[in-house]
Amino acid sequence: KPRKVKDKYPNLIYSTWDTVDRPRQVIVSDMTVIKYSWFFFELTMYFDVFTKEILTWHVAERRGHRDQYIDGLNDVINLLKGTDEPTVLHTDQGSVYASLAYNELIKDTLIVRSMSRAGKPTDNPVNESLNGWIKEELFIDFKIETCNSREEFEEALDAYVDYYNEKRPCYAIGYDTPNNYRKRFYKGELPRKDTFGKREANATPKFVTERKKMAGNEKNKE
């Protein structure tokens, strides 16, 4: 009898990747392994789906280490401080992403958890595509295989992320750079989309109304 796998969190954004309509509305995270010579690194990144920015990254040298996931999530929480709109954080069902310690960090925030279905990496196409060519550019253009220490590796990563966010044209956002695309949004230079209007009667997705109601209840208690 086949085993039924119960997903810890529902996939809130399945098939709606192209309808994300503002910065920080959906953030995705994943871990990828980078190996060369005798070095082994696990690189965990957090991306903004709308702007394509790399919001934060952390590295571990031990297989299965969890600090880089936690540190990245704390970076995201700090980045979102002061905002009053919910943010969906979408990941796969990796053990750290599913852990109590990880998800306890967001219990008092407006971050809503979403997960790919078990065994369905295509539920997170943003990360699946980004990880591949980011690793390719790190080796081809930034020569990370020449780094002889973790410090040199992190310096190369830092330089790459700066290049990626500030200088690298991105096809998905009209060959703009991620940081400039975000700035243009807040200047009102980008057309606003009605994310859910054509798909359901209520133009505001359920997870947004629920989190806003929660935020309102918390303010009333104060």
Where are these regions (language model features)?
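Mobile genetic element proteins and their domesticated derivatives, centered on retroelements
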Residues: 13, 30, 46, 52, ...
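Retroviral integrase
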Residues: 53, 62, 74-77, 104, ...
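Short small-residue beta-strand/loop micro-motif enriched in glycine and branched aliphatics
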Residues: 53-57, 113-116, 140-142
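Basic, flexible linker segments flanking DNA-binding modules
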Residues: 1-21, 120, 179-187
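Active-site beta-loop-alpha junctions of metal-dependent nucleic acid enzymes
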Residues: 39, 58-82
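An active-site-proximal beta-strand-loop segment
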Residues: 15-63
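C-terminal domain-tail junction helix/linker
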Residues: 107-111, 136-222
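RNase H-like two-metal-ion nuclease catalytic core shared by retroviral integrases
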Residues: 4, 91-93, 99-100, 113-137, ...
